[in-house]
Design a protein with these regions (language model features):
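Glycine/threonine-rich phosphate-binding loop and adjacent beta-strand/alpha-helix elements that clamp
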Residues: 4-140
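Sequence context surrounding c-type heme c attachment/ligation sites in exported
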Residues: 1
Length: 140
């Protein structure tokens, strides 16, 4: 929990350490305001693209890998006192489940997974002020 509002802005990343049971499957992560349940952002990734890029890689069942996940761009205000909840599933409400379901499960290792969330702090001194000419409407 934070004692002041947080402005989450940009591309949050989640490096999720998993042990897949199959050469296939996916992870869907939803970031929520823990007080209201409002969805702040989401990320999804097929395990075969765990290293990023456009080429699928063969995944060896039982091998520990890190999925380099990136959330869709976020621009959200998280009020003071609110926390963040991450909900993980295999498909989420916006995506179809993988073709190999239910045989392509993954064991997630949260203790070595990391998340980075870009936050902008505003204190009044760093607010964007656009230069105005003397004839600008807000100077009249």
């Amino acid at each position: 929990m934070c004692i002041r509002d947080r402005h989450i802005s940009g591309l949050a990343t989640f490096h999720l350490t998993v042990v897949p049971s199959f050469d296939g499957g996916q992870v869907f992560i939803e970031m929520q305001d823990s007080e209201t349940g409002i969805r702040l952002g989401h990320a999804t990734m097929d395990v075969r693209y765990h290293a990023g890029g456009y080429e699928a890689q063969t995944v060896i069942p039982g091998q520990t890998i890190t999925m380099l996940m990136e959330f869709q761009g976020i621009d959200a205000l998280l009020p003071a006192g609110h926390g963040i909840t991450f909900v993980l599933s295999e498909s989420g409400e916006d995506y179809l489940p993988p073709a190999c379901t239910p045989s392509c499960s993954m064991h997630i290792i949260p203790s070595v997974s990391t998340v980075e969330i870009p936050v902008i702090y505003r204190d009044g001194s760093n607010v964007l002020i656009t230069p105005q000419g003397e004839d600008a409407a807000n100077n009249q």
